[in-house]
From Swiss-Prot:
A matching Pfam family: DBI_PRT
Recorded family membership: Belongs to the CobT family.
Organism of provenance: Salmonella typhi
HAMAP family: CobT
Keyword terms: Cobalamin biosynthesis, Glycosyltransferase, Transferase
CDD domains: DMB-PRT_CobT
BP GO annotations: cobalamin biosynthetic process
Pathways per UniProt: Nucleoside biosynthesis; alpha-ribazole biosynthesis; alpha-ribazole from 5,6-dimethylbenzimidazole: step 1/2
UniProt protein name: Nicotinate-nucleotide--dimethylbenzimidazole phosphoribosyltransferase
Keyword Transferase: yes
Top-level division of the source organism's lineage: Bacteria
Classification via PANTHER family: NICOTINATE-NUCLEOTIDE--DIMETHYLBENZIMIDAZOLE PHOSPHORIBOSYLTRANSFERASE
Gene Ontology MF term list: nicotinate-nucleotide-dimethylbenzimidazole phosphoribosyltransferase activity
Amino acid sequence: MQTLHALFRDIPAPDAEAMARAQQHIDGLLKPPGSLGRLETLAVQLAGMPGLNGTPQVGEKAVLVMCADHGVWDEGVAVSPKIVTAIQAANMTQGTTGVCVLAAQAGAKVHVIDVGIDAEPIPGVVDMRVARGCGNIAVGPAMSRSQAEALLLEVSRYTCDLAKRGVTLFGVGELGMANTTPAAAMVSVFTGSDAKEVVGIGANLPPSRIDNKVDVVRRAIAINQPNPRDGIDVLSKVGGFDLVGMTGVMLGAARCGLPVLLDGFLSYSAALAACQIAPAVRPYLIPSHFSAEKGARIALAHLSMEPYLHMAMRLGEGSGAALAMPIVEAACAMFHNMGELAASNIVLPEGNANAT
């Protein structure tokens, strides 16, 4: 049985030679070099991923939505009843939520995964439940380290199994009432920022209750003392099962040499954990959209990422990841379908990168 250590060790490095070949090919297409901007850099990033065999391409697409409840809901940090997690998970199996509609438009399959819903099992939902909700981080750890490690492995294996069945582009999402609170705690720990700088309104928390949410995050960090140099410690102490699950998707996809589209603020916190646990994950992550949640800019700056979309979205669920999938496909189409300068006898002068 694969261990976490083996998983981290076996993440391949990007193929620098394939990236150089891709850049050379792109520079020879029917356009001034660099004129398609980040679409070009995205194509080069994809070309370096070993799971894509040296060329930007997209096969099957999947959005993995990690669903779980949080004990910290008891601290009054969310406006929605806890049962909404289970209700929305059931709605996802019917294809009626935001991520389902956007994923269908992108031609992606949504995998609804129960990693800790506080309700009876839901038909049509993948069962990876660790417990019925995690612990209240305001009074103790979210889970044990062994629970976090086991879930990371289980989700990474599930991700790799999907890769073996033809999935080459993954998106991550989550569902869980009150989960922006542990996400803010994780971002605070990993970036060294005060809770006041990263705590936002989540799912429309009234401004009058923000100070309480800030206080809850500060208490969670003070009580649990998570080690920012140990990603699993942070996940287990102030995270949640859904955040662990998203981290597992990133680790699993990277192990298979395949890209992962991040979603919003929740996924940024998981990405911070994944990159701390295994820095080799970073080249496989693609930021989809700039979350409207308050701590987004700080988290993205720490990840050195600039999202492709600015849509003022903060739904979660993986909605931004699904929305950005056509951008990845556009980068592949550009790479494979554009004509070449040489075939049209066009010779561009030196230093023409900024021509229009």
